[in-house]
Amino acid sequence: MMLNSLPCKDILWAYMRREGADKTGEKQLIINYLVIITRRQKRYKFDMTEQEVQDCLRLLKVLNPDLAVGFPKGSRLPLQNLPNTRDLGALMTEDGLHILPRKLLRSGEIYHASIADTRILSEEYNVKTVIDFRSAAEVKKKPDDIMAGVEYYHIPIRDEERSGNSFFERVMSCYGDGERYMRERYRSLITDEYSLKQYARFLDVLLHVKNGAVVFHSTTGEDRTGVGTALLLFALGVPKETIRRDYMRSNPCLEEELKYMRRLYRADRPENSRKLADLKAFYQVKESYINTVFDVIEKENGGIERFLRRKLYLTPKASEELKKKYLI
């Protein structure tokens, strides 16, 4: 079997592919394959039972912890206390390449990670870098529980001297138009000089990490992380519609969080129940928010390539290195 002759360290990505599934309901032969992709961009396919594929994937991961496993396409990680932690792996670029799974993980705060969550991130996803987009005040209140051997980068996206205000105070300041407030907030994330420098630093860190997976996160993983993810995916050549779909995945992930915040808000500010609509604007992403980002990039900066080069200082050489590092 050819699999026996492939050095494990030469394998970059392995996943199961199922062929023959028929949505019409008619019986059809279903074949499971183990798909292996090597550092030389060679692709191999092995006909196996589903159990054999799963056994091989587990063994390969033990032999090579850096190996990317699975075909997540932006799906949520199976974690207990982190509802919006997602793997950007397997998202496809415009030229047909894929992001390597288990390398780029977007998330909300990881302060509430359970022991089981920490084990999964450390052992199964081989997390070696954490990038924290939150303010110093947010970090002080809920610091990340950094795992052994993990490098931590604090890159606050918003200028703390100007951001101020607690979460509930921001809700109260919306004056019944939370969506307008959020669109302006998104606009500031890619026009404010301080925020742009921080996003540029984020891309630079991604470019220079040595090995393992990177978790980058804010508080809920929607806004600062959502914009950062969009900029990263643009830099990797992922099409706009794919970026929009990934962005909108935060809503089902945060349904329970929104319910909890509604209860908390009612208890804290019972006299302002009419503000609950504005609270929803904070805890749900909307296409109009990310479209604001797209419009600023395209209409005010001459397109994404010009924006990446002039605003985020991503040179053509750095762009190619980033793609080489995370795409296959």
Language-model segments: residues:
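Cys-dependent protein tyrosine phosphatase-like superfamily
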Residues: M2-V215, G228-I328
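Ser/Thr-glycine-rich phosphate-binding loops at phosphate-binding pockets of nucleotides
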Residues: T219-T225
